[in-house]
Amino acid sequence: MNQSFSPEVPQSFFQRDALDVARALIGAEFRVGKAGGIIVETEAYHPDDPASHAFNGQTPRNRAMFGPAGHLYVYRSYGIHWCANFVCAPGSAVLLRAIEPLTGIDMMKLRRGTDKLKLLCSGPGKLCQAMAITGEMDGAPLNAPPFLLRLPKEAAAISTGRRIGISRAVDYPWRFGLEGSAFVSKKFEPDQR
């Protein structure tokens, strides 16, 4: 993928609806230290969304979701895999579902234990493992090291579909992906574009 990027993203970018942020992040460059790539898949979550961790209010686990916009909300899924979200308006966030790896690929392969490029970051848990995102980063600001986030100068073509791996609000079309990307966690259905 050959494209140019804007300067780093200001915190104000995140101080809006998570649906808008989730779409705008498609095609953005995201790095943690030297490992990173292009965001190719996201999902949006609102505080009034039954599938959201914020739906029942603030708890110690989801405290970062109610904190400042432009910070990470990191949690463990099923007690196994870390998942990374970008906090938007209070109680809303964007889940990073997949990245197309571009930098630090050898390091990501080592962390993931695979040489298959398409499997390095094709899912929230895989992405966090490859990029060494852990619960210690919960609440960390995205505009400070080790993070780098830059938006594409040109809007990407986006596919839209239902979110994955949830049991509530399953029909919300709040999953977004870079159209035609081979690096998404699950292909978008033809009727969901």
From Swiss-Prot:
Its EC number is 3.2.2.-. CDD domains: AAG. Pfam families: Pur_DNA_glyco. The keyword DNA damage applies. GO terms for molecular function: alkylbase DNA N-glycosylase activity; DNA binding. One of its GO terms (biological process) is base-excision repair. It comes from the Bacteria. InterPro entries: Formyl_transferase-like_C_sf, MPG, MPG_sf. It is an enzyme of class 3 (hydrolase). Keywords: DNA damage, DNA repair, Hydrolase. Belongs to the DNA glycosylase MPG family. This is Putative 3-methyladenine DNA glycosylase. It comes from Agrobacterium fabrum (strain C58 / ATCC 33970). The lineage of its organism: Bacteria, Pseudomonadati, Pseudomonadota, Alphaproteobacteria, Hyphomicrobiales.
